[in-house]
Amino acid sequence: MSLANVVVIGAQWGDEGKGKITDLLSRSADVVVRYQGGVNAGHTIVVDDKVLKLHLIPSGILYPETICLIGSGTVIDPKVMLKELDMLLENSIDISGLQLASTAHVTMPYHRLLDEAMEQQRGDQRIGTTGRGIGPTYADKSQRNGIRVLDLLDSQRLRERLRGPLQEKNRLLEQIYGVAPLDSEQVIEEYLGYGQRLAPHVVDCIQTIHQAARSRKNILFEGAQGTLLDLDHGTYPYVTSSNPISGGACIGAGVGPTLIDRVIGVAKAYTTRVGEGPFPTELEGSINEQLCDRGGEFGTTTGRRRRCGWFDGVIGRYAVAVNGLDCLAITKLDVLDELDEIRVCVAYELNGERIEHFPSSAEDFARCHPIFETLPGWQCTTADCRRLEDLPTTAMDYLRFLADLMEVPIAIVSLGANRDQTIVVEDPIHGPKRALLSA
């Protein structure tokens, strides 16, 4: 039986259900690697009717034999990470397989304060940041002024590394944003304490991954957020500060592209977005409320109500292209169960012309009007279906329509939050690379 190293990415604006899909695939993985992002992302896993909400720790932590590595491309809030570890321990989940890259950057208290202050100052130009300090952490990383996990393990080095940044950030907080300064000694002592608790999990990320590759272990790379939030390829400036696309796995984990065998994109059967920015298929009124309520569309990280809309095939095809998707996992199909008809965006109208590509300008994107095709609904429950043939004919037709529109086959269909509410057409890790559910 062949094995594969797989990247799991979000094919929309995040919140697609990657946590469940990664959890499902983690059962077949030897190593699960989170390669970018921080506590601005979140995923929800349901185990034995228990809802576990994680922001930093990969879903694979639920499997004792699986190594879960938080890679160099991530930014770590140690306070949040330790809370997650404590929550897992309280639920009798073994955390010995968790490993943390020594070179991952650390979100400091001043990053969070600056993030909130800068977003507030933007006023009407706000971008919808989560306020968790992710952008300022990545900014310090780019300016070569950041703190890394390895710095938390050495008192002298941390004091030296923080001397300049703390002075600079306190000056910014006080003089520019009117925020009380931080107590430098208190910050240093607090983060040295975090370092002591995290020390048993800290490893050389590159050595860990490549040792696994040499041993022919299969590796699952887990992205956070989604394609349209990518810093370089998303709806800029309404994006995150890292690269959630599949190429980000190479940089954030420290591997070459030849190590990756397949890329699976996760997309909801409709579309959601949190925060600001254009959203051509966004719904208002009763259908929006219905999707939000049935889908439980509230952010894991922010608790904000998500904006809901019809499935957008234009951004879907874009996600296929920029990620090199081999197959799709379609989630929350069951949320559409009660609708008598379902619309799918197949193109946009921009300045009176039909376009089938994603505009690079946010201003142009905001002027796009969706061109829809309408399909019949199935108006019966799908949550109990476990095989493709159990699905209503119109639900199968809808999935085939999406596969044809996206020009990529569907490997997995999710019909609820629980693990068993899933139809696996083919295991992307163990199965042969062939056409799955397609038109």
From Swiss-Prot:
Keyword Nucleotide-binding found: yes
Catalytic activity as recorded in UniProt: IMP + L-aspartate + GTP = N(6)-(1,2-dicarboxyethyl)-AMP + GDP + phosphate + 2 H(+)
Record EC number: 6.3.4.4
Active site as annotated: D15, H43
Highest taxon in the source lineage: Bacteria
Enzyme class of the recorded protein, top EC level: ligase
Primary location: cytoplasm
Stated name of the protein: Adenylosuccinate synthetase
